[in-house]
Amino acid sequence: MSVSSCNTFTVHGITGEEFTKLSMTALKARALKHLEDQGKMLGIGHEDKPQSMYDNPQVYPQMFPWLFPYGYGGIGQARLKRKVSEAEHKKSLLMYHDKCFQTDQYFPIVAFNHEQMKAGITGSFLLAKRQKFSEISQRLMSLDNSILSGLIKRLTDGEHVRAETEKEKACFAVLDDLDHVGGHVKGSLTSKKYMRNEIWSLISFLGAPSWFITLSPADNQHPICLYFVDTGETFSLELRSSAARNRLIASNPVAAARFFDFMVRSFIKNVLGVDHDHPGLYGKTSGYYSTVEQQGRLTLHLHLLLWIAGALSPQEIRDRLISRDSTFQQDLIRYLESVHQGEFLTGSADSVRASVPMQTEARGGIHAVLQEQKPVNDIEAAAEYKDPTQTLPRPAPPRCQNLKKCDCKSCKSNGNWWKDYYTTVDDLLLKSNMHRCTTSSTAPATLPEDESSPSTSKTSKSVKQGPKGCLDHNGICRARFPRETHETTTVDENDGHVVMKKLEANMNTFTPCLTYLMHSNTDVTSLSSGTSIKAIVSYIYI
């Protein structure tokens, strides 16, 4: 069949384009006004029996008719069975070219919840210790089902239940002996137990880890993330306002997750040297273990334990330091100071702050959303200034072989690049790594004003929780700032303890090169004692 001409037609969705930019409060106000004006509506009923999420290819087209035109393309369709899993099908939909699945308000969370529910139902089982298996199996067979059902109902209703009769005690004894395992469910307590076992197995196999690294990519700042979020095909380093950036990021959580995955994989390959032809920044990597955690505003950051090939254990390092091996002490200090530090590169915090043309007006901690900035000092410099958190790192120019004696263009270009490197790293540290103690606050819940709806109130009478601060009721910082400062790196030859040079009390230790590459907050800690390793391991999987 040949088609000589084609006709275009418009498909009208449930809501028009003019409604997509309105807030939920404004939409409710519009709907109420429509009803008051005797406007018509479409009633959509539902069956008494809910739709099943198993073997039901039409459940997603029914829930999201605007995403599945004409009812085609549902998840779990017969022609894709045993070819593409439901999880992979959802991933492919989320990568659809026009990003309609990514930006839908409900599809990503509904699809993820279904995966979690199925994993919890089909991937769970009961686990018991082998030496108690015979005893527990007999106890299970002798349980009174009516008593067990009654306890379940009372617990479900929120009642605080205490075992009083022997039959009730037998039911509670089974709960103590059995461990409900859902290891396939991401984020479950059992998955955390698996993580703990994996970490300690790695420590048993590779020895003690040498470094603990935290990465916090700024999705609402980084141009790569904004490119993933936006619909444009051409990448550009366009600087946007904070409102525009935050609006884009909030509309597309999938793009933010893609950006985080890209940054982490780039870090592991290029900085750690994994599956690469060069050693890592900290040495030859023999292993790593990382976990992902969400922050208060639902963005992601990474905690990573790093093992270095040939690294000495904390006890071996301590023994060498106590033995007063001066050569080893000097080499160790030189290595530690070369890969992490706790102060600015070009001067004190005050001098760096004075040299930056733009300053952040208000922030709520190192992980908070950055606000608009105001110019200070030199107006001309402020006009040319670009916030480094919104730009990409500049590649280093080729290095001249005779750098110390040569004065060629390549050498001058290299010198200018290093000067820019130092100032950029300090600017990034000032914006991303300086801790500012704040108190928790509450504020009236403010609602966006709809110009077409005069009845909409600007401010709600309710009070919502404001940004959570780090100061407790005694005024003590929960993050343990300010920290102790030290003018130089010293070694206590009595107990082998190394005290690193640290000039900034409100800054964690970091790696300058890593800060420059990530253009965001990073923390790097040397694990030089067994106590610190145990504390970090517990922190990672809790």
Please report, for each region that a protein language model flagged, where it lies by residue:
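Intrinsic low-complexity, intrinsically disordered terminal tails and linker regions enriched
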Residues: 1-302, 306-542
